[in-house]
Amino acid sequence: ALITTGVDPTSLIQNNYPNYYEASAQLYETFQQWSSSSAIFVGFNNINFDEPFLRQALYQNLLPEIYMTVTNNNVRMDVFDILRLVSVYSPEHIKFNTDDQGYPILKLDEISKLNNISINYDAGPHDAVFDSLITLELNKILNIRCPKIWNSAYEFRHRDTPKRFMLDNLVFTNTTFWGRRPTIKAQTLIGGIPSRNHHYLVYNLLFDPVKIIELEDKDLIKKMNDGAKRIC
């Protein structure tokens, strides 16, 4: 982190920075103010990266409502996920570099330079405010250039939307990423998981479902454990 941000370790001691609890409490207070009348929390890779750290910080410092981004009518969006979908379904609308296998490199600092995204702020990449402002500008660009993808992401900001979508569509596609590599699967809904809200079982239609439906229970369990991703 020190190498990435360029922070001098001595400055952490010499400057009057807040300690871990104080910083967490400040974040908590700010988020509480934002969410007082419902909020959309937007970031860049915030759902899979930033939020787990935030929740852990709030938990460790005995601050309540660690799930505030998805409770009390609050919702969230991830610009990184929108950008990944654009790189698959509408790559002509955004400039990006590729790795040696041809997959998009979607680092925020590179994307901002390639697409001439600039802000009037005296800092650089990996500064929290700088990255937030760049993310905001990138979000605006994606909304303008790729409105269908952006609007879909906006609709899916609600946690109940996936269930409603799957009930309304017998067959649908699901785009997932393994590292930078996208995978598109045709799937159908099996049902929910009683012990886990907002988690669902779907069937991968790459495999013939008739052969699965006809199996005895013991054979079905064996099939589910053979490594093939029939049910996700």
Regions found by a protein language model. Name each.
Residues 16, 45-47, 206:
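Short glycine-rich, polar/acidic loop-and-turn segments at beta strand-coil junctions
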Residues 15-29:
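Glycine-rich, highly charged phosphate/nucleotide-binding loops
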Residues 141-232:
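Acidic two-metal-ion nuclease catalytic site recognized across multiple nuclease folds
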Residues 20-21, 33-34, 54-55, 179-182:
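A short linear-motif detector with a strong N-terminal bias
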Residues 17, 21, 48, 129-132, ...:
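Generic detection of long, well-ordered alpha-helical segments
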